[in-house]
Swiss-Prot record:
Glycans are attached at residue 3. This is G-protein coupled receptor 171. GO terms for molecular function: G protein-coupled peptide receptor activity; neuropeptide binding; neuropeptide receptor activity. It comes from Mus musculus. Induction: Induced upon antigen stimulation. Highly expressed in hypothalamus, including the arcuate nucleus, paraventricular nucleus and dorsomedial hypothalamus. Expressed in periaqueductal gray (at protein level), found primarily in GABAergic neurons and to a lesser extent in glutamatergic neurons. Expressed in T cells and natural killer cells. Coiled coil: none annotated. It is found in: Cell membrane. Residues 1-21, 70-89, 154-181, 246-268 are extracellular. It is a multi-pass membrane protein. Belongs to the G-protein coupled receptor 1 family. Keywords: Cell membrane, G-protein coupled receptor, Glycoprotein, Membrane, Receptor, Transducer, Transmembrane, Transmembrane helix. The chain crosses the membrane at residues 22-42, 49-69, 90-110, 133-153, 182-202, 225-245, 269-289. Disruption phenotype: Deficient mice exhibit stronger antitumor immunity.
């Protein structure tokens, strides 16, 4: 870092964000724990979409581990070693969750599209064995990209306030961080195209079936697609609109102090939207997994209402 950047108070005034991060954490941990319980209780036959949702849930638990540390660090009450740990480990867990979520939402969209367009066929990509294999490949790929940021040696710098994670990185660590950012943006762009195309094809197929006698199912399927698309756009698009300019400000390509501060605040605000997928995901589980819907029905509906609801849900296809 240059002297000019040393005196630029980029990493201050984070306390207002921490309250929202805490709210996301609280809602997310409750929803994720309930979802885990529901899947364990009810899921016996795993279809592809259930496998992808379980992987999404696993990624969400990584985020719940990381958020408390981020909150403590951003409040300015963390000891120095915890701040270093956050930069090396928990910050990376947040991004591991983000890109796993993006990829698995794309696979959910593909599976949904194939179910609607070719309902009488089962392709290799729709087999549970393939879903498990591709899930393992996705985890391995994301970890290979992210884990080096955790293990690359860092600089031993003097304890001080207003320090950013980039200041701990040596030259190789900075270069890897920059490469990681561009790879992640490429992942986002490619899987965004997949999600948009899959959902467009699915909506077109539903539009063709709008006069079908089974209209309630068509309407329900349309709702599922719109939920996935809306949660994806709200959570991930704003962050990636800011990510490249913010990365350039970290590497001194953008050196104006006021611009760097504005980009950092924009990054934190859009990161808050990105981690809010922790709150949206239980809603997706409810609409996309019959096992989850059944457990919610059993738990929260009155005994008189729960039985007919359960019978109706069991008669539906697991989506």
């Amino acid at each position: 870092m240059t002297n000019s950047s040393t005196f630029c108070p980029v990493y201050r005034d984070l306390e207002p964000f921490t309250y929202f991060f805490y709210l996301v954490f609280l809602i997310g941990i409750i929803g994720s724990c309930f979802a885990t319980w529901a899947f364990i209780q009810k899921t016996t036959n795993h279809r592809c979409v259930s496998i992808y949702l379980i992987n999404l849930l696993t990624a969400d638990f990584l985020l719940t581990l990381a958020l408390p540390v981020k909150i403590i660090v951003d409040l300015g009450v963390a000891p120095w070693k915890l701040r270093i740990f956050h930069c090396q480990v928990t910050a990376c867990l947040i991004y591991i969750n983000m890109y796993l979520s993006i990829i698995f939402l794309a696979f959910v969209s593909i599976d949904r599209c194939l179910q609607l367009i070719h309902s009488c066929k089962i392709y290799r990509i729709q087999e549970p064995g393939f879903a498990k294999m591709i899930s393992a490949v996705v985890w391995l790929m994301v970890l290979l990209i992210m884990v080096p940021n955790m293990v690359i040696p860092i600089k031993d710098i003097k304890e001080k306030s207003n320090v950013g994670c980039m200041e701990f990185k040596k030259e190789f660590g900075r270069n890897w961080h920059l490469l990681t950012n561009f790879i992640c943006v490429a992942i986002f762009l490619n899987f965004s195209v997949i999600i948009l195309i899959s959902n467009f094809l699915a909506i077109r197929q539903l539009y063709r079936n709008r006069d079908n006698t089974n209209y309630p199912s068509v309407k329900s399927a349309l709702l599922h697609i719109l939920l996935v698309t809306a949660s994806y756009i709200i959570c991930f698009v704003p962050y990636h609109a800011v990510r490249i300019p913010y990365t350039l400000s970290q590497t001194e390509v953008i050196s104006d102090c006021s611009t760097r501060i504005a980009l950092f605040k924009a990054k934190e605000a859009t990161l808050l939207l990105a981690v809010s997928n922790l709150c949206f995901d239980p809603i997706l589980y409810y609409h996309l997994s019959k096992a989850f819907r059944l457990k919610v029905t059993e738990t929260f509906a009155s005994p008189k209402k729960s039985k007919p609801l359960e019978e109706r849900l069991r008669s539906e296809n697991d989506v």
